[in-house]
Amino acid sequence: MKKVLALMVAATLGLSSVAFAADTTATATPAATSTTATVAAQTKATQHQKHKVTKKTTEQKAQAAKKHEKKASVQKAPVQKAQAAKKHVKKASVQKAPVQKAQAAKKHHKTAKKPVAAPAA
């Protein structure tokens, strides 16, 4: 930005000095007009040129291209864990078939008995 401003100031000072020189030296009228034309052409050329900014190579990589080197951290086992963090390991126990079932688990096969009519006496 500062370079562009400096170029603009230099161009305006250059034009004003050429115009001042053309006004003071009236004897060299053809030479003064040719110099103002060349200076005007140069200023137009400098105004339309884009200055290339040299970018420094950044060492920025894409997130996926970064190599994550994880160091193997040695963690000691915590002495006490929270209740929710405890792992419940249930061992598979061999169950034998129960000899006697509970009363509610028994299957009741009741046959409906008809009431026996008592003889009339």
UniProtKB/Swiss-Prot annotation:
Residues 40-121 are annotated as: Disordered. InterPro entries: Acid_shock. It comes from the Bacteria. Keywords: Periplasm, Signal. The keyword Oxidoreductase does not apply. It holds the Pfam family Asr. GO terms for cellular component: periplasmic space. This is Acid shock protein. Residues 22-63 form a propeptide. Residues 74-83, 94-103 have a biased composition (Low complexity). The keyword Signal applies. It is found in: Periplasm. Transmembrane segments: none annotated. Proteolytic processing gives rise to the active protein. Its main location: periplasm. Residues 84-93, 104-113 have a biased composition (Basic residues). Residues 1-21 form the signal peptide.
